[in-house]
């Protein structure tokens, strides 16, 4: 980690200089009130969101939305963007190969997502204790939250590489991508939506299988197959955008 100058720059800007602290403040200042209000205010739905039994669901879904959204923005360098060296400068002036730049971006994204979940952990664990959620379900939730936040944010890295010199284009893409994908997954096939899938797991409900070519495909297999394809496409697109930008 110490030998990668690109990664070290991101760590210095976010944690040494403190430019990234605002991200974690935003996450906590939104998550904490939602959790407390969902416990003490009247329920929104008597069957799904009633009282303490659903507290962990509310907290987990809110954490999912916040971590995915802010991870995409961090990957897109929307915080303290003026402090980061450009990709071309790293490649041409500092001699950093494309692989090292991509590796540093992915490692820092992993670090950011892990830290975000670590900060949210006390609230999630407290909600799980009140809702009497089994430890195995809590551990599975943390794994899914990391998987979704990291996977979706890789498209932020793609936007950064493709439109590095056009900050407004990147910001519009990230926000449009986030909301469009959420809505489309609800309309096309509900189990593909991470919110619906997470709620189904926490509620111990199973989606009906999808019949394709005379074979019934389990919803879980379709969900993870679709997401692995989605994330794999993002990683390939990120590499392609880096090569395109750095070879101009």
Feature locations, PLM:
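Glycine/proline-centered hinge or cleavage motifs at structural transition points of membrane proteins
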Residues: 94-95
């Amino acid at each position: 980690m110490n030998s990668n100058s690109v990664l070290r720059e991101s760590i210095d800007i976010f944690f040494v200089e403190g430019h990234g602290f605002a991200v974690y403040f935003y996450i906590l200042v939104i998550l904490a009130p939602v959790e407390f209000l969902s416990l003490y205010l009247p329920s929104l739905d008597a069957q799904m969101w009633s009282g303490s039994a659903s507290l962990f669901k509310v907290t987990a879904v809110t954490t999912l939305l916040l971590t995915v959204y802010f991870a995409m923005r961090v990957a897109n360098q929307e915080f303290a963007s003026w402090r980061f060296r450009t990709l071309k400068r790293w490649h041409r002036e500092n001699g950093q190969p494309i692989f090292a730049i991509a590796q540093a971006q992915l490692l820092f994204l992993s670090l950011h997502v892990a830290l975000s979940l670590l900060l949210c952990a006390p609230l999630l664990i407290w909600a799980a204790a009140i809702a009497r959620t089994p430890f195995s379900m809590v551990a599975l939730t943390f794994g899914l939250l990391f998987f979704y936040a990291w996977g979706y944010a890789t498209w932020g890295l793609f936007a950064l590489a493709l439109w590095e010199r056009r900050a407004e284009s990147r910001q519009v893409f990230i926000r449009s991508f986030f909301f469009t994908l959420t809505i489309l997954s609800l309309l096309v096939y509900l189990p593909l939506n991470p919110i619906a899938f997470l709620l189904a797991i926490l509620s111990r409900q199973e989606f009906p299988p999808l019949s394709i070519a005379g074979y019934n495909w389990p919803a879980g297999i379709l969900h993870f197959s679709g997401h692995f394809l989605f994330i794999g496409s993002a990683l390939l697109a990120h590499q392609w955008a880096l090569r395109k930008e750095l070879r101009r």
